[in-house]
Design a protein with these regions (language model features):
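Cell-envelope and extracellular/periplasmic
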Residues: 20-396
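Bacterial N-terminal signal peptides
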Residues: 5-16
Length: 396
């Protein structure tokens, strides 16, 4: 009897711990999906009791970033020679270029793995400055059609409408196809990213997150009535086409889909006087982004995350207040009677009046980029990434 028990014990250790299909999540969009939060801004998470637990999941006690053994990622990164960065999830899968950056992928991967409690794979395809109306335009949306105002402007400038249409056609859908190409390449060789991939069990496309929008929102040529009711209806229609086409092309008809609704600047209801001129544009665009979730075919399988809810109002106000220092510096620069030392002292005194030491610390560690990149804040993008994972879990 004893030899049989030993044999059974040995067999049990040879069975893969995870016999389910590998869950694969697709993260797609433009610069905010890339992520422009410098690694140093992670410190800000620890300054808020609500986000401190996220930092513990990201860093070890010594402050060094953890490598997450059960989360694997393949990410487009044009700053490296191969054009792709892949491996186990850690910091550094944000936008390429200067310094280590993070995007929503970090806390998304951490949170999603906690939800499913098994290894997962992330495939991230994002490029800065790309629109849905042209760059990511899905096949079923048809060709880009110039509106009457655009045609009129071409005629006024003596430009060839025929050439403009040819040029637009060349650009149309390029990044939709690149997204598919990279995704299908990874899915065809998962073991090159995740060495322990069980080919017998295969994979499951378990979720898609779309975080894009800025280039469409600011495009007054494509959306000439922007800010008025219904002015971004074309975006809603294109996004619905996008969801359908992605599901068709990836042979995943019920692929759970999260729309990350643009929210840089925070809730519109909290906009101060200086931001009111943007309120109608931001408001109408956010409505248009979320609109597909109301379609009957998407009920229960497409949801929206309003990223405005994770905007840091305190951090934003501190950044706005810092603008007064820059204005003061320009004012002092005009006074030729002051020495350099006197100007520096005047700025230091002015800063001390404007900020407490704690506020200066928050400002120092909390931001690394502009407002349209969510202030380059790991705290904001960290909460957004977690929200994406939580939202997917609810519909999958």
């Amino acid at each position: 009897m004893k030899p049989i028990c030993i044999l059974l014990s040995l067999i049990s250790f040879t069975v893969p711990l995870f016999a389910n299909p590998l869950k694969v999540y697709l993260l797609v969009g433009q610069s905010n999906m890339q992520g422009h939060a410098a690694e140093r801004t992670l410190q800000h998470l620890d300054m808020d009791p609500k986000t401190a637990p996220l930092l513990k999941a990201i860093q070890n006690a010594d402050g060094k970033a953890k490598t997450h053994q059960d989360v694997w990622i393949s990410s487009i990164d044009t700053s490296v020679e191969s054009g792709v960065k892949q491996g186990q999830l850690t910091v550094g899968y944000g936008a390429g270029g200067r310094g280590v950056k993070i995007g929503p992928e970090l806390t998304f991967g951490i949170t999603m793995q906690q939800h499913v409690d098994e290894p997962i794979l992330l495939i991230k395809t994002s490029w800065g400055g790309k629109s849905l109306n042209t760059d990511f335009r899905p096949p079923s949306a048809g060709p880009y059609v110039f509106n009457e105002k655009q045609i009129e402007n071409y005629k006024k400038r003596g430009k060839s409408l025929t050439e403009a249409r040819k040029e637009k056609a060349k650009r149309t859908g390029v990044y939709y196809r690149l997204m598919l190409k990279h995704t299908q390449k990874v899915l065809g060789s998962i073991e090159s990213v995740y060495p322990n991939y069980n080919t017998k069990e295969g994979y499951e496309l378990a979720g898609f997150v779309w975080f894009q929008g800025w280039n469409d929102m600011v495009d007054g040529s494509t959306y000439p009535m922007r800010g008025q009711p219904g002015s971004y209806d074309a975006y809603s229609k294109n996004l619905a086409h996008f969801i359908r086409d992605v599901r068709k092309d990836l042979k995943a008809p019920k692929l759970p889909f999260v729309i990350g609704v643009m929210g840089a600047g925070g809730p519109i209801a909290k906009y101060g006087p200086e931001k009111q001129r943007y309120a109608s544009i931001h408001g109408e665009f956010r409505k248009a982004m979320a609109a597909p979730i109301k379609l009957p075919e998407f009920k229960g399988n497409v949801t929206a995350v309003f990223t405005e809810n994770y905007w840091d109002e305190q951090l934003s106000e501190l950044v706005d207040r810092r603008g007064k220092i820059n204005a003061k510096r320009r004012e002092l620069a005009k006074d030729q009677s002051l020495t350099r030392e006197q100007r520096e002292k005047a700025i230091a005194d002015f800063t001390d009046k404007l900020f407490s030491k704690e506020e200066l610390k928050i400002l120092e560690v909390g931001t690394s980029n502009a407002a349209y990149h969510y202030l380059g804040s790991a705290k904001i993008l960290g909460e957004i990434g977690k929200a994406f994972a939580d939202a997917l879990t609810k519909i999958h």
